[in-house]
Regions:
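Tryptophan-paired
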Residues: 4-112, 146-150
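Extracellular beta-sheet/turn segments enriched in Thr/Pro/Gly and aliphatic residues
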Residues: 99, 105-150
């Protein structure tokens, strides 16, 4: 969270109520018998409609001074596809009802088998891509049992 949220004693409570991602295709034909599994996103007909999804809230990291920035994480699963810059929008809404929106300047390709992190900075009445940008890493296997994801 950017400087707009910096307070003398830091930021102890999460100011973000929700995160939504708009402009994505959310339906696909998946062939689990093929190796590797094939995912074909449906982009036409009744199921080929761009949709909005609500991201799952994750960890909030508070700060105790005005120079540090608090952090909030959200997560969601998006089918592999090209996110069109004309339709793709990330919206963060605060607990006071204020909305912050970000759209990319270029299309973004989401590949199968990768975990993407979209690093945004919110404050000064805007939502921008931070210097860390967008990162992509391969999914990793872990032993069974309860797990928390990013």
């Amino acid at each position: 969270l950017g400087t707009e949220f910096n307070k003398k004693d830091g930021l102890a409570t999460d100011p973000i109520q929700s995160a939504t991602i708009s402009g994505i295709y959310n339906h696909a034909k998946i062939d689990v018998w093929d190796n590797p599994v094939k995912v074909n996103v449906i982009t036409d007909g009744v199921w080929g409609v761009r949709e909005k999804i609500i991201a799952t809230p994750g960890a909030f990291t508070s700060v105790d001074n005005e120079k540090a920035n608090a952090k909030k994480q959200f997560s969601c699963i998006v089918l592999p596809q090209e996110l069109n810059k004309a339709y793709f929008v990330v919206t963060l809404q605060t607990t006071t009802g204020k909305k912050y929106e970000w759209s990319p300047t270029e299309n973004i390709t989401i590949e199968s088998g990768k975990k993407y992190t979209l690093n945004l900075s919110m404050g000064d009445n805007k939502l921008v891509l931070s210097k860390e940008g967008i990162t992509a890493n391969a999914w990793t296997d872990v032993a069974g049992g309860p797990r928390e994801t990013d």
